Design a protein with these regions (language model features):
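LRR N-terminal entry segment and analogous cap-like coil->beta motifs
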Residues: 2-46, 51-56
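Intrinsically disordered, low-complexity regulatory regions enriched in Ser/Pro/Gly/Thr
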Residues: 4-8, 27-29, 49-50, 71-72, ...
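Conserved hydrophobic beta-strand positions in leucine-rich repeat
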Residues: 11-15, 32-37, 54-59, 76-81, ...
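Canonical leucine-rich repeat
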Residues: 23-26, 45-48, 67-70, 89-92, ...
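A generic tandem-repeat structural signature
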Residues: 38, 43-132, 137-139, 148
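Eukaryotic tandem repeat interaction scaffolds
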Residues: 131-231
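Leucine-rich repeat domain C-terminal region
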Residues: 209-215, 219-292
Length: 292
């Protein structure tokens, strides 16, 4: 590793891809607000307790096995330990100011030990081994929750998250849309690549602007006439065969994008024309913009 000279006055320190194997020598940083140690060879979180001014810590893509030694960084607002080898969520109890937490692509099997993070606005736990949505009922300020590419079988334990505007649970093992009745502020819902068979359970989600239920097992577009704020509707790779189903979207006057490819509907030689006639506000059908 080359010798790194640090400016004690620096507020933003970026040591991305420096082949750093050990966190050391950073106590000289008296004013540091953001410390980026992405893509290094760090195995252990250590020697950071002096950095009381730190607001953002980025440890993305290292070899870290455990969240530890962060107790002193009580002012931390953004923490990214994605693409490491973490097995547990732990060691965060003192980080009560944390607003964004990224733990993507680790080996985490359980959501736990987050109850003190009541300022948290964004939680990203995609690409882990999580089987259940649990232990998040104290996170009432949460705005965005990302749980894609896990092993979740049921939509549950979301009732307390009334401020949630973005929920992403793509590529899991869901079979039913449920448990969303309290999420009245939800604007974006991503449920693609699951085993969902029926569109249901969205009665209270009137503010939805984006609904992605692509790559499921849905035979009918139904129960969404009340979603009049909808701007994007992703329904490709399902089993839709009846053109009259598009009537469900007629009230969505702001609808601009629909994905319906790889449904039985697409076999119709008038496929694009029929969508344009049924949904005149649409500007994009599948990946192609509408020509006028």
């Amino acid at each position: 590793m080359e010798t790194i000279s640090l400016d004690p006055e620096a507020e933003d320190v970026d040591l991305n891809h420096f082949r750093i194997g050990k966190i050391e020598g950073f106590e000289v940083l008296k004013k540091v607000k953001t410390l980026c140690l992405r893509q290094n060879l760090i195995k252990c979180i250590e020697n950071l307790q002096q950095l009381q001014t730190l607001k953002e810590l980025d440890l993305y893509d290292n070899q870290i096995r455990k969240i530890e030694n962060l107790e002193a960084l009580t002012g931390l607002e953004i923490l990214d330990i994605s693409f490491n080898i973490l097995r547990n969520i732990e060691g965060l109890d003192q980080l009560t100011q944390l607003k964004k937490l990224f733990l993507v692509n680790n080996k985490i099997s359980k959501i736990e030990n987050l109850s003190n993070l009541q300022q948290l606005q964004m939680l990203e736990l995609g690409s882990n081994r999580i089987r259940a949505i649990q232990n998040i009922d104290t996170l009432t300020n949460l705005d965005s929750l990302f749980l894609g590419k896990n092993k979740i079988t049921k939509l549950q334990n979301l009732d307390a998250l009334t401020n949630l505007t973005v929920l992403s649970i793509q590529s899991n093992r869901l079979t039913k849309i449920e448990g969303l009745q309290n999420l009245v502020n939800l604007r974006e819902l991503y449920l693609s690549h699951n085993g969902i068979e029926v569109i249901e359970g969205l009665e209270n989600n009137n503010k939805l602007t984006m609904l992605d239920i692509a790559a499921n097992r849905i035979k009918k577009i139904e129960n969404i006439t009340h979603l009049i704020e909808l701007q994007e509707f992703w329904m490709n790779d399902n089993l839709i065969e009846c053109w009259s189903d598009l009537d469900e979207l007629k009230g969505a006057k702001k609808l601009e994008t629909v994905y319906l490819e790889r449904n039985p509907l697409q076999k119709d030689p008038q496929y694009r024309r029929k969508i344009m006639l049924a949904l005149p506000s649409v500007r994009q059908i599948d990946a192609t913009f509408v020509r006028f």
